[in-house]
Swiss-Prot record:
This is Protein bps2. ATP binds at residues 28-35. It comes from the Archaea. The gene is bps2. Transmembrane segments: none annotated. One of its GO terms (molecular function) is ATP binding. Zn(2+) binds at residues 292, 295. Keywords: ATP-binding, Coiled coil, Metal-binding, Nucleotide-binding, Zinc. Residues 243-351 form the Zinc-hook domain. Residues 243-281, 320-351 form a coiled coil.
Amino acid sequence: MKVRVYNIGGIVSPLEVELTKGVNIYKAPNAYGKTSLAKALVSLLTSAIKPDDLLNVFANSGYVELDLDGRTYYRRIKRVKNKIMESSKLLLDDDRALLLSYFSPENKLLNQIMSGEENVEWFISATSKINELKSKKEEMETKLHNLQAEIDDLNRKHKEAIELQTKIKQIEDEIARLEKEKESDKVLNKTTQTISITNENKLRDIKEKIEVKKRELEDLQNRIARLDQEIKNKESLASPEIRQSYERQLQEINAQLQKITAQRNEAEIEIRLLEKVLDQIRESEKQHLTTCYVCGSHVDPSIWKVRIDVISKELQEKNSLYAGIKKEADELLSKKSEIEKKLKELDQISSEISKLKMSRSELENRIESVKSTIDDLERQRREMEERFNRNAEIYRVYDINDSINKRIEELKKKKDEYEYELAINGIPSTILNKISEKQKELQEVQKMVDDLEKEYMRRLTIAREEFVKIANYLLKELEFDLRAEIDENDRLVVKRNDATLELRKLSSSERTTLALILVLTALKSYFKTPFFIVDESFMTFDQRRFDKIVKYLNSITDYVIITKSDENIELLKETMEPLASS
């Protein structure tokens, strides 16, 4: 695997590093770009790292390129007229890489564990993507419910269609009987009667057309009224004042976040320094050293206890300050996410309003067309009635079958109504086909719901089970007298001799180990990373324990990359047998 980096972060000269499978140790002086190299590599795994965060602030172009298995992956960035442009081909795009591919002081989980926060529910949710799975399951359950409702509605329509067909057949039989009876009783001039009937049929046809168009007009007017109400409702939710309010809040939060981030970084540096000093003083006190490890002067061994108390108190105060800053930052980030979500919802509502207004315009055009048709038909009806009335005496006939004709007309009108209902409702065979299709779709969705439920339950339990398995294996291998588990409330529980310990009271090495074990659990259970980067500068392990951790990492990922501070620049390939994974 070959990496090329230029003008990314602190790397301002072209850098090329060739890595081999296994453990690679990259040594370089402080401020030489080790962190920038790590960030460049991780940026090929997720677009969550933006090009603005990668490109050196004084550079106009930069790149990170990776050759792996005969393919080249890259992020090439240019600054054009104060705008950042990028072309990219990522190895993968998964924001979990920020948590699961780079273990450094910037790792969010490590910061939480080091501050003594025991709740890891957010980490399990983020790495297992269980919330996405839950949302998908709920979406499928809603679809399942809707499909069942559609099938129930289709069954109702099928029953109604059968009843309508039966009624239509009964009317047709009755009309046929009356027509036969009428033919046998005719006493009038057939030609004269035919003229009268023809005129009546024409007039009836026009009236029926008018009624159909009036029903269509009423339906269109109702639809446009509903659209107006919907537009009004949505416009009340997306007023310019609401958007401006959200944008002002977002600007204020960003300003506060920038200030709090600086405070948090300063507190982190002070805490790491105090923890390192405390560990060294504890070790000096444990060995009853009489020489100061800093200046080399003689020290009374009893003074180590006093120094431990002083440093511990100061560290406690700094941790308390850091926790407050972190809590405030988390609250601001939560508010920022909520406001950004609200702004996206406003954009969606504005888009929907535009579509609704287009639909309304189309309906208005259709209404005008239908009104014009109705006016034309009404004109034809009036002219026809006037013409028929003028010729009434000419075409008037005496017919003993008037009552039969009246009954036939009533039956035909009723039949037209039933046929109109049947046309809207649908014929039985078509409805049966739709029912069959919906039932097949329902079975497929039901299977998806069942599969999602199984996967949801699997992901809920695998994190706890796998963590206990890996944690207690590694804690034993690293000779820490601890046991660890995740309880039903997704809290990290640590015990020694069956006594539950407070996370903040563990040593920095023990807390670092627990954070790393959580990352390893997620790697084995949910996420396959091509490489894993460890910043050794903050690790407080002794070399023997650190080597065992590295061996375990080597067993679950192809490339392990360790960055170390050194006066010289050097890339070492370390040969070691992978520690068998638990």
